[in-house]
Amino acid sequence: ELELISGNDKDFRMLKVYIQSETYPHMEGWSRFGLILRQLGRVKQAIDIFRIVLQEETDKNTKGWLYCQIGACKADQSKYEEAIEFFEKSIQIGERHPSNLEGLATTYGNIAVIYDHFDDNDKALLYHEKVLKIQKQLLPHNDPNLALVYNNIGKAYLGLNEYAKALRYH
């Protein structure tokens, strides 16, 4: 339960400075608060915050990011079908407004992880390959994040019993 306090409260000001410096310094306001709640395991409250922000938001990229955050929270709750629905909403926006390719790759990766979890290797592979396509555009060829994507693709091929293809990615 949240309680309204005065902005002049000394402890609150100290906490605010600490939070701003240590947690998501690139974020502001309610979005940052939602991320902190999620990090603290208060996933339901984080979802509530993200939904409120989503209702007020007009920027398409930010809406896509918010859908992705709600999807991640749903995945934290093991509500994977709901998570995928929110990730897909994020993707719809990201594909129409591709100025945030990094966010789109993250969302594809989130879906791939869910399919990995359920050993749905065909779908996982599809999304890992989408991540790879974007990451190759954004990252240098020796970036460790690319290695992770290649490994994930190899694991998907391994799950499909396509060992020769799996070896090419490991």
Please provide the spans of the model-predicted regions.
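Conserved alpha-helical positions within TPR/SEL1-like repeat arrays
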Residues: 31-39, 62-76, 102-117, 144-159
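Amphipathic alpha-helical segments of tetratricopeptide repeats
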Residues: 52-55, 89-99, 132-137
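Short coil/turn linker motifs that delimit alpha-helical repeat modules in TPR/alpha-solenoid proteins
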Residues: 22, 58-59, 97-100, 139-142
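Long, contiguous interaction/recruitment modules in multidomain scaffold/adaptor proteins
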Residues: 1-29, 37-45, 55-57
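Short, charge-rich amphipathic alpha-helical segments embedded
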Residues: 48, 52-69, 99
